[in-house]
């Protein structure tokens, strides 16, 4: 048993040598404090007027823990009293000037942020409009009919007659009706719907023919209907 206790102490000394040293130092401090308390107290008249001598005298007369607690309380009272000291006139003016300066700076920065956000929104809306116009310019030829498609699909059309039921005639020999396109609203028709309606018109006795003129610089500009009525009056497509 003694060997076990001795081995534990040796292990503790090797692992934590400061633990044994602290216990020894604490023992010496308590012994020194008891010796001082047993001595005769030093009269206050023998102490000097300096603050260090007063603290040293109090330290000799009172225990260490109580002295530290009292000193902490005195420091706390001193710091709290210093905080509640009324500032002078110059100090108040300086604080007011700093506050006004900070307030003006914050308001100016807030206005700059608002202007930056507004400019960002305007640029975003402007960019959206430009992108939409660009996309529309690229997508319109894909959705609406163009001049090469009309010439490719409607270069020759069948024409009904009393003698011959159907025959082929070139577009240059057919009369033009330019106002009919705008009146019927087929100028804005998409290409698939226009093909379907013209496909039904080719099978009817009354025939309407869609072509483009030579001066077609604008998109879907100068579009004409060529209509030919030989056996029946003109019918809607």
From Swiss-Prot:
It comes from the Eukaryota. Keywords: Milk protein, Phosphoprotein, Secreted, Signal. Residues 39-60 are annotated as: Disordered. This is Alpha-S1-casein. It comes from Notamacropus eugenii. Important role in the capacity of milk to transport calcium phosphate. Mammary gland specific. Secreted in milk. Its main location: secreted. Induction: Maximal induction is dependent upon prolactin insulin and cortisol. Residues 1-15 form the signal peptide. InterPro entries: Alpha-s1_casein. Belongs to the alpha-casein family. It is found in: Secreted. GO terms for cellular component: extracellular space. The modification Phosphoserine is found at residues 79-81. One of its GO terms (biological process) is response to dehydroepiandrosterone.
């Amino acid at each position: 048993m003694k060997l076990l206790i001795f081995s534990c102490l040796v292990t503790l000394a090797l692992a934590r040598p400061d633990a044994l040293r602290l216990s020894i130092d604490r023992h010496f401090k308590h012994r020194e404090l008891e010796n001082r308390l047993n001595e005769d107290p030093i009269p206050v008249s023998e102490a000097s007027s300096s603050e260090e001598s007063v603290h040293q005298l109090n330290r000799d007369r009172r225990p260490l823990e109580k002295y530290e607690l009292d000193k902490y309380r005195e420091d706390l009272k001193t710091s709290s009293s210093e905080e509640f000291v009324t500032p002078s006139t110059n100090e108040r003016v300086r604080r007011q000037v700093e506050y006004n300066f900070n307030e003006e700076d914050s308001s100016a920065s807030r206005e700059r942020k608002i202007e930056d956000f507004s400019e960002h929104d305007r640029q975003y809306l402007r960019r959206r409009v430009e992108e939409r116009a660009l996309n529309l310019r690229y997508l319109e030829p894909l959705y609406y009919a163009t001049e090469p498609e009309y010439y490719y699909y409607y270069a020759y059309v069948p024409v009904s007659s009393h003698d011959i039921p159907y025959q082929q005639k070139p577009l240059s020999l057919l009369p033009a009706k330019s106002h009919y396109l705008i009146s019927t609203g087929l100028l804005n028709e998409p290409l698939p719907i226009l093909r379907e309606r013209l496909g039904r018109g080719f099978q009817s006795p009354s025939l309407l023919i869609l072509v483009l003129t030579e001066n077609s610089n604008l998109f879907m500009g100068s579009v004409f209907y060529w209509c030919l009525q030989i056996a029946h009056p003109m019918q809607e497509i």
